[in-house]
Amino acid sequence: MAAPSDPPTAATPPAPPPPARRCLLAPSVEPLLFLATLALGLQVPLATQYLWDRLGAERGYVGPNASSPHGCGNGSGAVDPLREEVEALVAHWNLCINLGGFFVGLFSVTLFGPWSDSVGRRPVLVLPAVGMAVQAAVYLLVMYLRLHVAYLLLGRIISGLLGDYNLILAGCFASVADSSNQRTRTFRVAILEACLGVAGMVASVGGGQWRKAEGYINPFWLVLAASLAAALYAALCLQETVKQRRAAKLLTLQHYKAVYKLYTAPEDLSSRRKLALYSLAFFLLVTVHFGTKDLYVLYELGSPLCWASDLIGYGSAASYLAYLSSLGGLRLLQLCLEDTWVAEIGLISNIAGLVVISLATTTPLMFTGYGIMFLSMAATPVIRAKLSKLVGETEQGALFASVACVEGLCSLVATGVFNSLYPSTLHFMRGFPFLFGAILLLIPAAIMGWIEIQDSNLQYSHFSDASSSPADG
């Protein structure tokens, strides 16, 4: 009898909520990561070249710079002391800027990452994108107003306080872990890593040419625009992936304790041991990636390769293509192999390619090394996915915050170790750092193989016990 009193139009009021949606589509974090990586990929080399030109001009140095199109420009002529002074100053400021950003970011990433497990991923993706935009704006002010280069450090610290690029990495990978299941997670992570490669390729190929044509100002406006676009996408279009959000204090030591407990909590000793071993494997693998990538251009510029800028560009594009070929190879190999063995094949590809590059004396042999490394990026998404599967749903933010900090540490260690090793070994083998990297990669290969064999033996023993127990009964 109450039914007639309900008007037929009573179902229409719930309609207003859809227009309240902030965006027509809220698909995934891939566009956000692409934009942020594009901004970073443009900014880092441009900032280094700007420091070179600015500091060189202040000291009256007018010789060739790091972006000159000459191959073997450092032939057998006398060493220019003024050039050495400029190189030392650029290295000094680069080190200060990178260290300042790393140490500030170390505390902010491990604060915001666990916080996102409670309040959601969107806030911790908006903040670092805004920080990167502020950093780009500060860099533009330095260029327009010819401010002291120390202001570049200020921009980097501001970005670090808001989490910097490492927090974007942590938030994106945690978001993928939230929205994927155990079976599909590895491939979803690989898609994210492919975005890193595509964005890096676009920045590498386009940024240098644009700088040569129009200077520094216009490319840095694109850095600012890409960072702002990433922030707007995260704020307005990105779908929240944390299912059960709750209010949580930001400024508390509990967030740092959450990261610490990942590796020390005694509930599941086996999982925590695997977490530490996989983290070590990830550290070594990414350190080799960063360290060798830093040396490719130096190696190609020197004798006997003597590459000009066009060949260097092709080589850079070939190294980034490994992200895409690894994605396709991972997908195909997953049809017949466990993820660990796919990663082992990727490590073998990486090791073989580095050995060939270490011995390369001709252009075809150098490109052969790049070609052999077509599966070299298959191991990192597997390790990230393995780490993600070892922790609970409410620990993904804390986990990927710690992984992002490890990645930042890898960059510093790689720069220190490989850039020191290269000049020290020139007198007996120019390619020794690549051979050293190949040897280091044997350690993560051994770690992953050992864990997989141990797990297989454990599963086999459980299966044997289960099959023999009915007979005993």
Swiss-Prot record:
Tissues expressed in: Widely expressed, including brain, aorta, liver, kidney, spleen, small intestine, pancreas, ovary and testis.
Single GO term (MF): folic acid:proton symporter activity
Superkingdom per UniProt: Eukaryota
pH dependence (record): Optimum pH is 5.0-5.5.
Region span, Disordered: 1-21
Disulfide cysteine pairs (residue numbers): C72-C306
Sequence positions that bind H(+): D164, E193, H289
Subcellular location: Cell membrane; Apical cell membrane; Basolateral cell membrane; Endosome membrane
Alphabetical list of Gene3D superfamilies matching this protein: MFS general substrate transporter like domains
Keyword Nucleotide-binding set for record: no
Residues linked to a glycan: N65, N74
Keyword Manganese: no
Topology relative to the membrane: Multi-pass membrane protein
Pro residues compositional bias, start-end: 1-20
Primary location recorded for the protein, binned into one broad class: membrane
Membrane-side (Extracellular) residue stretches: 49-90, 144-148, 212-216, 298-310, 360-363, 423-430
Topological region Cytoplasmic: 1-29, 117-120, 163-185, 236-274, 334-339, 385-396, 450-473
Keywords: Cell membrane, Cytoplasm, Disulfide bond, Endosome, Folate-binding, Glycoprotein, Membrane, Symport, Transmembrane, Transmembrane helix, Transport
Family per record: Belongs to the major facilitator superfamily. SLC46A family.
Subunit-structure text: Monomer.
Function statement: Proton-coupled folate symporter that mediates folate absorption using an H(+) gradient as a driving force. Involved in the intestinal absorption of folates at the brush-border membrane of the proximal jejunum, and the transport from blood to cerebrospinal fluid across the choroid plexus. Functions at acidic pH via alternate outward- and inward-open conformation states. Protonation of residues in the outward open state primes the protein for transport.
Name the UniProt record assigns to this protein: Proton-coupled folate transporter
Lineage of the organism: Eukaryota, Metazoa, Chordata, Craniata, Vertebrata
